[in-house]
Design a protein with these regions (language model features):
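Amphipathic alpha-helical interface segments
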Residues: 34, 178, 437
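Alpha-helical recognition segments enriched in aromatics with Gly/Pro capping
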Residues: 72-106, 121, 180, 199-413
Length: 528
């Protein structure tokens, strides 16, 4: 059952635009977005009434609504991988359509994956700040993510073979965990999370159309391949020109398969000996290639045009290069206006990999007693298109600062006034310069000329994009007489320069959950 606190939040949000994450009967999660009409109904942008069961809600967020006076006069510009320049993200008719490559649900998303998903959230929030409507689609790859075009090894099937668990059950388990992590990171839900397994008709239709247009062919092995040479501008996104690509440019080269050209890729693979996750098609039972799902989904769900396409830098080639070739061939136009890629994330100086044993999950951060939004905070300290080296030290520092900022807002009262700040707005709208925004927040915190209420209002303005829940509130705990006695004894010990006793008392207080700081004004404390 949904906790009373969550039900209360829903009941108190009538008339507001919200996103509610619901658990389906099959264990999967979906998001409904719209204006809340009652505790069980909302109206989406198309005017449709969506009925939901609040007892299946696992996360709930009110989507920020900006007053005109709080909206930036500027517009968001992002670095476009295609043109290698900053481009204004304007959309059409006051709305921006975004497609973000989602997870392949055969394992938990690690913190590097989550950095990319955070990017789409920051973009959406910033566009909303500039007064634009946002439609975000993020796919769920639950079939078709092959290790290569030759063997047809599907990552989910490989996990199924290893664990002896049904492949679709594996997909639903990790899809649920993915949505749980998004909620923990305060990432607003997308308008749609289409599953590859549920878009087979659209993918088959797209492949048929590509064959008609002479951009695809049935290979000698019976599988269907995209003809890379049929798309003259192949390589414009990644810089990998066809004439420069050599056999084995993506995978270990093999002579197997029915391709005409080594750079062609599979759109549909015949099942062969495979017995799971296969579908009927005009070419025989089989399964889709990885790249076709994003073309089919984005064209269908975003009306044939994507204003902004977001993904990790590792997807630029071959996935996005191939997707662009497919989509443009299907629409006859440049389907995506702007391509944005987030850079790699290292952890303590090393690339994360399962074999190296240094993959870090959001749950690992929580297990260390850190606020999950400490990860969001730490990621905000770095520009999205700069490689970042995350560490436990930076996460712990983020946790400490997050607590301090929440305490600052709590001490200032519970006002909801938001105060516009031009420097913060400029930082967000200039290629998502979140490090500059964080520096500005720190400057506001230290500025003694800004009153407590104004600081709170400025922090709330920033938090509409930062998404750190700075007004969440701080748990109030009473100091027991025993703890007060320890605090007083430590003050006495320091006055007597009994440093050994002072340190011992600090440790005892820390064990009780108190964090002690010594400064020019003497001893201060806060709850951990």
């Amino acid at each position: 059952m949904t906790s009373m606190s969550l039900r209360t939040q829903i009941a108190q949000a009538l008339g507001k635009r919200v996103t509610i994450r619901l658990r389906d009967s099959d264990g999967g999660l979906r998001d409904v977005v719209g204006v809340l009409q009652s505790e069980t109904e909302l109206v989406n942008r198309r005017g449709e009434i969506i009925t939901f069961d609040p007892d299946t809600a696992v996360a709930f967020r009110v989507i920020p609504v900006f007053n005109r006076r709080d909206i930036s006069s500027g517009s968001l510009s992002m670095y476009d991988t295609m043109s290698r320049t900053l481009k204004e993200i304007s959309g059409r008719d006051g709305a921006v359509r975004i497609y973000c490559c989602g997870p392949t649900v055969y394992r938990d998303a690690h913190v590097g994956n989550l950095r990319t998903f955070l990017l789409s959230d920051l973009v959406s929030r910033t566009l909303q700040m500039t007064g634009l409507e946002v439609t975000l689609v993020q796919n769920i790859t639950d079939v078709g993510h092959m290790a290569d075009d030759f063997t047809g090894d599907d990552k989910i099937l490989a996990e199924s073979a290893k664990t002896k668990v049904d492949p679709f059950e594996i997909a639903r388990i990790f899809e649920t965990r993915f949505h749980t992590d998004l909620a923990r990171l305060n990432i607003q839900g997308a308008d749609s999370y289409p599953r590859a397994s549920e878009k087979m008709t659209e993918m088959i239709s797209s492949i048929e159309r590509l064959i008609e247009l002479k951009h695809a062919y049935v290979g000698t092995d019976g599988s269907v391949y995209f003809d890379a040479t049929s798309f003259p501008s192949y390589g414009a996104l990644s810089g990998n020109k066809l004439e420069a690509l050599k056999p084995g440019h993506r995978y270990e080269f093999t002579d197997e398969g029915g391709k005409r050209f080594h750079a062609d890729w599979a759109l549909w693979k015949l099942a062969g000996a495979r017995t799971q996750m296969i579908w009927d098609s005009p070419w025989g039972a089989g399964f889709p290639g990885w790249h076709i799902e994003c073309s089919a989904m984005s064209i269908e769900l975003l009306d044939g045009h994507v204003d902004l396409h977001i993904g990790g830098i590792d997807l630029r080639f071959p996935h996005h290069e191939n997707e662009r070739a497919q989509s443009n061939s299907l629409t006859g136009d440049e389907t995506v206006d702007t391509w944005v890629h987030g850079e790699h994330l290292l952890f303590e100086g090393r690339k994360m990999s399962k074999s190296a044993g240094n993959v870090v999950l959001l749950q690992d951060i929580i297990d260390r007693g850190l606020d999950p939004l400490s990860l969001r905070f730490a990621l905000l300290e770095n520009r999205y298109r700069s490689q970042m080296d995350l560490s436990w030290a930076s996460l712990e520092a983020a946790h400490t600062t997050l607590k301090r900022w929440r305490q600052l807002l709590a001490d200032a009262g519970d006002g909801t006034t938001v105060k516009f700040d031009q420097e913060l707005s400029d930082a967000f709208t200039t290629d998502l310069d979140t490090p500059r925004a964080m520096q500005r927040i720190r400057a506001i915190e230290k500025d003694i000329s800004i009153g407590a209420l104004d600081k709170r209002a400025l922090f709330l303005f920033a938090d509409q994009v930062l998404g750190l829940d700075l007004d969440r509130g701080v748990e109030k705990k009473e100091i027991t007489p025993e703890l007060q006695a320890l605090l007083d004894a430590r003050i006495t010990a320091r006055a007597e320069k009994n440093w050994h006793m002072s340190d011992s008392l600090r440790d005892q207080l820390a064990d009780a959950g108190l964090e002690i700081k010594d400064g020019p004004g003497g001893q201060s404390w806060s709850w951990k």
